[in-house]
Swiss-Prot record:
The gene is gatY. Zn(2+) binds at residues 83, 180, 208. Dihydroxyacetone phosphate binds at residues 181, 209-211, 230-233. Belongs to the class II fructose-bisphosphate aldolase family. TagBP aldolase GatY subfamily. It comes from Escherichia coli. HAMAP family: TagBP_aldolase_GatY (MF_01294). This is D-tagatose-1,6-bisphosphate aldolase subunit GatY.
């Protein structure tokens, strides 16, 4: 009942003029932070995981946790495959119960990207599974994939329309100047490009690489059509730095129930801020 499709979430966001945050989690504690914070704020959220996370934690384990927490907190949740690239991997996760997928073929030439994505869409839609794909490519590192800045490229607005129509995707991830990881200096986002994409494509648009973006930039992208905001690195950094600080100050600590609390608290602050930036509090 409480594990829902991202398609309905994002369509609601598009109509309501806000964005749904997708938080990348890795284990029980990081999932607890996201779900507890979202439930307290009555905010829709997406629980996202890269291929590495699903391998690390196990698909069935993650699904069981999401289902149990959704029921415990009486809060709708979606679980999402983030930056998955292999058809067999996606199909296996769907058979386990995942109902939202990002197929990332953005590294391929345009025609091959369309072909790969359409294959996944045709399969997923048979099971009422929503599909996100990316046109353009972000720089930085996501999981084990490293894209050099020189190889990154922005989304072409006219191609975006052709891509959306040819593939039948439910949401489109765009490249407008963000990158995976944290920024050494503030990025300059191409808002005019985003506005142009919005004029060509009526699907919910997705922004990857949002860790470290200013509130002003996030809210401007939402005004121009972004309906899903992905955050990963900022969560990991907050969690790990707080944990390091605690263990440095308390070298005698051995109980994870104690030393993980400061890490969870630091991550909770980031989740709360992103929810506020997305304008989705009270929208669940």
């Amino acid at each position: 009942m409480y594990v829902v499709s991202t398609k309905q979430m994002l369509n609601n966001a598009q109509r309501g003029g806000y964005a749904v945050p997708a938080f990348n989690i890795h284990n029980l504690e990081t999932m607890q932070v996201v779900v507890e914070t979202a439930a307290n704020l009555h905010a829709p959220v997406i629980i996202a995981g890269t291929p590495g996370t699903f391998t690390h934690a196990g698909t069935e384990n993650l699904l069981a946790l999401v289902s149990a927490m959704a029921k415990q907190y009486h809060h709708p949740l979606a679980i999402h495959l983030d930056h998955h690239t292999k058809f067999d991997d996606i199909a296996q996760n769907l058979r386990s119960g995942v109902r939202s997928v990002m197929i990332d073929a953005s590294h391929l030439p345009f025609a091959q990207n369309i072909s790969r994505v359409k294959e996944v869409v045709d399969f997923c839609h048979r099971f009422d599974v929503s599909v996100e794909a990316e046109l353009g490519q972000l720089g930085g590192q996501e999981d084990d994939v490293q894209v050099n800045e020189a190889d990154a490229f922005y989304t072409n607005p006219a191609q975006a329309r052709e891509f959306a129509e040819a593939t039948g995707i439910d949401s489109l991830a765009v490249a407008i100047g963000t990158a995976h990881g944290m920024y050494a200096s503030a990025p300059v986002l191409d808002f005019s490009r985003l506005e142009n994409i919005r004029q060509w494509v009526n699907l919910p648009l997705v922004l990857h690489g949002a860790s470290g973006l200013s509130t002003k930039d996030i809210q401007q992208t939402i005004k121009l059509g972004i309906c899903k905001i992905n955050v990963a690195t900022e969560l990991k950094n907050a969690f790990s730095q707080a944990l390091k600080n605690y263990l440095t100050a308390h070298p005698e600590a051995t109980d994870p129930r104690d030393y993980l609390q400061s890490a969870k608290s630091a991550m909770r602050d980031v989740v709360s801020k992103v929810i506020a930036d997305c304008g989705c509090e009270g929208r669940a």
